Design a protein with these regions (language model features):
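Gram-negative outer-membrane beta-barrel transporters
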Residues: 146, 250-252, 272-371
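Conserved C-terminal beta-signal and adjacent last beta-strands/turns
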Residues: 140-141, 231, 286, 301-302, ...
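Hydrophobic, lipid-facing positions within transmembrane beta-strands of outer-membrane proteins
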Residues: 6-10, 74-80, 132-138, 183-187, ...
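Transmembrane beta-strands of outer-membrane beta-barrel pores
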Residues: 28-32, 86, 97-101, 156-160, ...
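Membrane-embedded beta-barrel scaffold of Gram-negative outer-membrane proteins
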Residues: 19-27, 190-203, 207, 224-280, ...
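Outer-membrane beta-barrel channels and translocator barrels
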Residues: 17-19, 86-89, 145-149, 157, ...
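Flexible, surface-exposed loop regions and adjacent strand-edge segments
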Residues: 1, 38-49, 104-117, 166-175, ...
Length: 452
């Protein structure tokens, strides 16, 4: 990528009294850049190029070419806040308005049949995205009791989003004009006494689709905004020797934007709306000082991440890859993609005089690449450990020399952390194409730090 930005900020703060202050920020960012790639055997119609007639009079529908895809954008706005800090009450209110204006366009820089280009640096698509994003909020935290406080946070957010022009997919026209109005409240109570702490909270959060949701949408797909209702409660206890904690959560979604397992042409992970889904689980944390020179800490997350009544949409082609129709399979309750049921971490830290060491391990359960809960489209569970050792020398001619050696993937686990998949029905058979992002085996890194 060849991309540059210029960022400008103007910030003003005013202290009105011991209790009140105000802040105002104006900002502007301009960016422009591109990436360039070679496409072998590209269809000329995908680049709005006329068919090439060779010397024998044959029509050539494909050519090798170099394309350059550009982004030129402006982002600017204003952010304001007023803050009150009293003995029992802390209060903030504010507003913001921001606008993003971005041009996406592509040029054919070179083609094997150069006389096929209507003009140098031929532009084959251009579209403009414009996003106006404004919000107002107020939040308060009140000390109800020396050991008890409550908080309330309310936000209104409005969005106007448009995309207009031709897309890079065979010049398809894109026309998006969407308005959203969101109300995002959050409330909770916190309790603290001695080494004990507990909380309960409820919040609502809304999220709009992004550009890819519109430009990469499937046939008859109409991206919607996501709404989350989040319920959480937790308890913890700690002292100078150990600490434990447990958090319970239930996240109820409407139209959740969920990873599909598919990727775009440039490798971006794609999402799509799922009407009814949830995530629920428990997060456990703990730690203990085993000795003055040794301590352990760890965490464990156990969860269920489910789609209710998932309907798989699958494209159907004939033997020559001509599109026939789109079928739908009702799969019932399935697992959400890339959402393992178990994640566990453990870390031992050792320190003795000038020597230190740490040993950490992580286990991640099975992750499904798409939302069908099909095992042959999944990432296997993996367990990985890393070891770090260090020693600090204190010579007379300088403050210190610190030497660290880290061995990653100590036991040479063969594993992947991400993947993509494309599946279709071709000539009556299930077709699958996938790719896995494999991770490095055992590897080491050494570092020397000098302090004067």
């Amino acid at each position: 990528d060849n991309y540059r930005q210029q960022n400008y900020h103007l910030t003003a703060s005013q202290r009105l009294s011991d209790l009140w202050n105000m802040n105002l920020t104006l900002h502007y960012t301009h960016g422009a850049g591109y990436y360039e790639d070679y496409k072998g055997g590209a269809k000329v119609k995908d680049y709005k190029l006329p068919p090439y007639i060779d010397s024998q009079g044959d029509t050539i529908a494909k050519t090798d070419l170099v394309r350059r895809k550009w982004l030129e954008n402006d982002f600017y706005g204003a952010i304001y806040s007023a803050n009150y800090r009293g003995e029992r009450l802390q209060f903030s209110a504010g507003a913001a308005i921001n606008r993003y204006d971005g041009d996406h366009f592509g040029r054919v820089m070179w083609a094997k049949q150069s006389n096929n280009l209507p003009e140098p640096d031929y532009e084959y698509y251009r579209n403009t995205g414009d996003k106006l994003d404004y919000n107002m909020y107020a939040k308060a935290n009140y000390q109800l009791h020396p050991n008890l406080n409550g908080y309330l946070d309310m936000q209104y957010r409005g969005i106007h989003y448009t995309i207009e022009g031709s897309d890079d997919k065979a010049g398809d026209h894109v026309n998006v004009d969407k308005h959203w109005n969101f109300f995002n409240p959050k409330a909770g109570i916190n309790f603290q006494k001695g080494g004990h702490n507990a909380f309960v909270s409820f919040s609502v959060a809304n999220r709009e689709p992004n550009r890819d949701n519109f430009t990469e949408a499937g046939r008859d797909e109409r991206p919607q905004h996501e709404t989350l209702y989040d319920y959480e409660a937790g308890y913890g206890f700690g002292n100078s020797r150990f600490h434990v904690g447990a958090n319970l959560y239930f996240m109820d979604y409407s139209n959740q934007l969920i990873l599909t397992g598919k990727i775009s042409e440039i490798g971006e992970a794609l999402t799509s709306n799922i009407k009814d889904s949830y995530r629920m689980g428990i997060e456990l944390t703990g730690g203990v000082e085993i000795a003055r020179w040794l301590d352990w800490s760890g965490n464990l997350t156990l969860s269920r991440n489910k789609i209710k009544n998932f309907i798989e949409s699958i494209e159907v082609y004939d033997a020559d890859w001509n599109f026939l129709r789109e079928d739908h399979n009702d799969l019932g309750t399935t697992d959400i993609a890339f959402s393992p049921d178990i994640i566990a971490n453990s870390m031992f830290n050792f320190s003795w005089k000038q020597f230190s060491a740490s040993f950490n391990s992580q286990f991640v359960g099975r992750q499904y690449i798409d939302n069908t809960s099909c095992k042959d489209r999944s990432i296997d569970p993996y367990f990985v450990s890393n070891l770090r050792v260090g020693y600090v020398f204190k010579p007379k001619f300088m403050k210190e020399i610190a030497l660290d050696v880290t061995i990653n993937n100590l036991f040479n686990e063969q594993y992947e952390t991400n993947a993509w998949v494309y599946s279709a029905m071709v000539d009556g058979e299930r077709y699958k194409e996938d790719g896995y992002f494999t991770q490095a085996g055992t590897n080491a890194m050494a570092r020397v730090t000098f302090k004067f």
